[in-house]
């Protein structure tokens, strides 16, 4: 069964890959993005990869009137909500900006969805809500111990969604917590290309590989690992996109 899905932040790293996978699965897609951390060129690449047209609206998800217009013009059946700011360090320096953007966009979106009678949403949360876990691997029941404003905005959005669904069983909500997505579409035409200074490790590595940076500094030599440097787990962005499709 095909549906028309609204993707907020759909021009971004995970959103663009998810848009391709949705269209490959036969769904129709509408993307809303303010392009604050993505490029307009990504839209043409999404269309070329999927071999299908989709609708794009350049708008901030905090703009309720813009969302109302989208829902009025398209028979949206569900929403995947990626839009938001995501840099941990930046959130510590600019907490109010993060609360305004991440909470404001979620609240405005939910209100617009309710007005339109669209009550299916997949929310892009983060494993940041677990803070520094005492045991690994992390499970859904692991203790939540947020350590930064970014993670706190994600957890607060989760709480909003839980309270909303508890108050109105017509809502269908899926919350996905993940971290460290890497990789790119097999074509290489879309991947992680953030505007400005990257917030993740892999873009720095690729910039060194292609000569945009001379070197990459590795910090820390006393971790409990064979060589003392840090170790991280990663998830491929296409696998993550397929997870959103399944949700």
Q: What is each of the regions a protein language model found here?
A:
Residues 162-245:
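NAD(P)-dependent short-chain dehydrogenase/reductase
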Residues 1-184:
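N-terminal Rossmann-like NAD(P)+-binding domain of SDR-like oxidoreductases, especially those catalyzing
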